[in-house]
UniProtKB/Swiss-Prot annotation:
Disulfide bonds: none annotated. Pfam families: NADHdh. GO terms for molecular function: NADH dehydrogenase activity; oxidoreductase activity, acting on NAD(P)H, quinone or similar compound as acceptor; quinone binding. Keywords: Cell inner membrane, Cell membrane, Membrane, NAD, Quinone, Translocase, Transmembrane, Transmembrane helix, Ubiquinone. Belongs to the complex I subunit 1 family. This is NADH-quinone oxidoreductase subunit H. It catalyses: a quinone + NADH + 5 H(+)(in) = a quinol + NAD(+) + 4 H(+)(out). Its main location: membrane. Its EC number is 7.1.1.-. NCBIfam families: PRK06076.1-1 (NF004740), PRK06076.1-2 (NF004741). GO terms for biological process: aerobic respiration. NDH-1 is composed of 13 different subunits. Subunits NuoA, H, J, K, L, M, N constitute the membrane sector of the complex. It comes from Klebsiella pneumoniae subsp. pneumoniae (strain ATCC 700721 / MGH 78578).
């Protein structure tokens, strides 16, 4: 076993962590689609999926089998390469962002010193998936949905980044592990409450979730930028949306709610419970809020979220300078 050097062991452990995180996040995203339908049924005083398996427990398996056997159709006048590339980017962009999230003190795939910047870069990469899907489909509804999505995502990514600068200033680092360790005694949600509110709103918008789902509004755009997709390509878009929810929920926990910190229970359990809570909040928001007009969404971002993030950053900088004196 002389070939098993310490460097090789580190590489193998990193690969193992990446595979485990990949399987867990994809599984959580898939099961969230089933849980969302059950919870929406509960909120709306009706039954959710309850036909396949005991209490609908095998509905997810039935959906996966149906997705595998559906025709993988590509429109005749579409750009085939870009049309195929778009769902792959949508699936992998926010999945890669989860690599920087520390699940426990010893379990993180990539402990980057520029962790937050890496997340913002991956969130920006997701815009290309939407643009590619809308433009390559050669469909007017798809293109309109892509234009809406790109404008909305680029706008709310400004607030997404600015809302994190207060957290970075307090921790003195872009490293996610350092930010969690800085919350050992006080969670960032207390001194950075406005930053948390803005980040949560922008996170919902970046995931294109209700009430910020105008890019795929069924009543207006007939499902928006992925109207021409079917089979596994549509499945990648579908699961990618829920992976985005898992990633944003995990980032909210890591940046504002102490990450794995908590009494009595093991660190991983605390992280999982907090993340599951915010995943349920995504579902509750969908069940309870109406969909505003597109102009109202953009106006809310630039007239409410942007001033709020700037005020939060200004107050944070003033407090840090006052404490340094």
């Amino acid at each position: 076993m002389s070939w098993l050097t310490p460097d090789l062991i580190d590489i193998l452990l990193s690969i193992l962590k990446a595979v485990v995180i990949l399987l867990v996040v994809v599984t959580c995203g898939a099961f969230m689609s089933f849980g969302e339908r059950r919870l929406l049924g509960l909120f709306q005083n009706r039954y959710g999926p309850n036909r396949v398996g005991w209490g609908g427990s095998l509905q997810l398996v039935a959906d996966m089998i149906k997705m595998f056997f559906k025709e993988d159709w590509i429109p005749r006048f579409s750009d085939r390469v870009i049309f195929t590339l778009a769902p792959v980017i949508a699936f992998t962009s926010l999945l890669l962002a989860f690599a920087i999230v520390p699940v426990s003190p010893t379990w993180v795939v990539a402990d980057l010193n520029i962790g937050i910047l890496f997340f913002l870069m991956m969130a920006g990469l997701a815009v290309y998936a939407v643009l590619f899907a809308g433009w390559s489909s050669n469909n007017k509804y798809s293109l309109l949905g892509a234009m809406r999505a790109s404008a909305q995502t680029l706008s709310y990514e400004v607030f997404l980044g600015l809302s994190l600068m207060g957290v970075v200033a307090q921790a003195g680092s872009f490293n996610m592990t350092d930010i969690v360790n800085n919350q050992a005694h006080l969670w960032n949600v207390i001194p950075q409450f406005f930053g948390f509110v803005t980040f949560a709103i922008a996170g919902v918008a970046v995931c294109h979730r209700h009430p910020f789902d105008q890019p795929e509004a069924e009543q207006e755009l007939a499902d928006g930028y992925h109207i021409e997709y079917s089979g596994m390509k549509f499945g990648l878009f579908f699961v990618g949306e829920y992976i985005g929810i898992v990633t944003v929920s995990a980032l909210i926990v890591t940046l504002f709610f102490g990450g794995w910190n908590g009494p009595w229970l093991p660190p991983f359990i605390w992280f999982a419970l907090k993340t599951a809570f915010f995943m349920m909040m995504f579902i509750l928001i969908r069940a309870s809020l109406p969909r505003p007009r597109y102009d109202q969404v953009m106006s809310f971002g630039w007239k409410v979220c942007l001033p709020l993030t700037l005020v939060n950053l200004l107050v944070t900088a003033a407090v840090i300078l006052w404490q340094a004196q």
